[in-house]
Amino acid sequence: MNIEVGNISYTGAIISWSSSEPCLEDYYHIMYRPNWNSIFSGYLRYSFHHEEKVPRTISSVVLEHLAPSTLYFLCISCKKAAFPYRHYCTMFHTLDKSPLAPGSSLVDPQISLWVLMAILLACFTAVLAFICLQFWCVRCHEPRWSYRAGHMEEANGLVRWPEEAPDLGQREEDLQGLPLVEMPRKNSRDGAELDPEANQDAPDAGALQRGGGDPPAILPHCGE
């Protein structure tokens, strides 16, 4: 079947066809719809918005009340001997009602929709990339390792000691300047008797105090 579309205007068109095989039914099925959603729907009969029945003795029809500047998808079908139902389809575009009017849009609405979706997707990708970059920068500027109070802390190559560290160092220096005195072992068997040699070698605490020196440090011994 050959389909021809002629006399296309803003809101109408004339459709004519010629078939080599006769139609077994009493009429032809003329189905058409705007092609706005052709990407998302197939060429099914139930997806057509308009359907007209034309007697088989007629080979042309006038379509009216069409939308200006719109792409239409049209199919003609009839029951034949070789094929129960076969669709013959074509496409045509109505004229623009005011192509030279100021402010008129010559862009297809479907193309505008795809461009808008692409812009929104690009904006979302840019925002997501910015958030990931900020998170990566924060992770890079964090200290490599650190410890809490009582330990050494390192941040950006600088070593910081806790506040207790200088006090501990001063206490050790103070203890190093004091003499050591051995205390008797209380829990040992010979704890009651003191070694005379140890008593002779041990300095007199009173003499040290009279001499103005520092008092001796007494170190306890654990019991055996």
From Swiss-Prot:
SUPFAM superfamilies for this protein: Fibronectin type III
Record keywords: Membrane, Transmembrane, Transmembrane helix
This protein's name: Fibronectin type III domain-containing protein 9
InterPro entries in UniProt: FN3_dom, FN3_sf, Ig-like_fold
GO cellular component: membrane
Annotated ranges, domain Fibronectin type-III: 1-101
Biased composition annotated in UniProt, kind: Basic and acidic residues: 183-192
Keyword Transmembrane: yes
Lineage start: Eukaryota, Metazoa, Chordata, Craniata, Vertebrata
Tree of life domain: Eukaryota
Membrane topology: Single-pass membrane protein
Transmembrane segments: 113-133
Region: Disordered, residue numbers: 175-224
Subcellular location: Membrane
Transit peptide in keyword set: no
